[in-house]
Amino acid sequence: MALPLAFLFTSPGPVLVEIGPITIRWYGLLIATAVLIGVSLSQYLAKRRQVNPDLLSDLSIWLVIGAIPAARIYYVLFQWSEYAQHPERIIAIWQGGIAIHGAIIGGTLAALIFAKLKRVPFWQLADLVAPSLILGQAIGRWGNFFNSEAFGRPTNLPWKLYIPIERRPPDLASFEYFHPTFLYESIWDLMVFALLITLFFRSLAGKPRLKVGTLFMVYLATYSLGRLWIEGLRTDSLMLGPLRIAQVVSLTGITLGLAGLAWLYVRKRPLPDVVSSPKDTE
């Protein structure tokens, strides 16, 4: 008799392997994998756009330095009542507890500074990074699976996720199975990635001719749309009073993304497209 599908979504635990005093966690491995794949992809896309791929290698360092600390700070700020009592946990990022919206904010600020220093168009960089960013998010979400965190409400759907009792919210301790929101978001992110990559390669042939900034705006709007829905299922949302912070930020992301696209394509002033871009020489 086949095992219920739910057992396919039972975390083996957060630790991949322990070698003496060294502990390698799934979360860290997935983040590292996402970064490596993202850098390689963005370099490849840069070559196709006739942009120096080394520029993207340098940018990736700035993005990591900007995004990861910002993701942690964002999370800690909205969980301050807990971390104020245990300040030693603030730096324990390997235990989980980072917010993708914080990473996007920190990474964007880092990219703006990088673009200013290198004297290259920010929006050109943003377009080249957008597919890598959403693919990295799809990979990184599986860290939530291994940590048994960021899951949804109780459910009996065939694809339900088992959560150990010690990881369940106190008011839901009697429930065993929950929505695998990590899976929902990972699938959504892959769909957004497919859309962005399709637009990128079709634009190489000029069908359609995309203006600089298009891919990033599409990323911002579409990712935020999926997150808006998925966040409503979660049991551990960061809150500000009665509001789910991620949903507020997602609504903002949808608005900014759509407004950005309207600004690019509706206004009368012609803007350069991204069919051919000059090589960076630095």
Swiss-Prot record:
Keywords: Cell inner membrane, Cell membrane, Membrane, Transferase, Transmembrane, Transmembrane helix. A 1,2-diacyl-sn-glycero-3-phospho-(1'-sn-glycerol) binds at residue 141. It is found in: Cell inner membrane. It is a multi-pass membrane protein. The keyword Cell inner membrane applies. The keyword tRNA processing does not apply. Its EC number is 2.5.1.145. GO terms for molecular function: phosphatidylglycerol-prolipoprotein diacylglyceryl transferase activity. Disulfide bonds: none annotated. GO terms for biological process: lipoprotein biosynthetic process. Pathway: Protein modification; lipoprotein biosynthesis (diacylglyceryl transfer). Signal peptide: none annotated. GO terms for cellular component: plasma membrane. The chain crosses the membrane at residues 19-39, 59-79, 90-110, 120-140, 181-201, 212-232, 245-265. NCBIfam families: lgt (TIGR00544). Catalyzes the transfer of the diacylglyceryl group from phosphatidylglycerol to the sulfhydryl group of the N-terminal cysteine of a prolipoprotein, the first step in the formation of mature lipoproteins. This is Phosphatidylglycerol--prolipoprotein diacylglyceryl transferase.
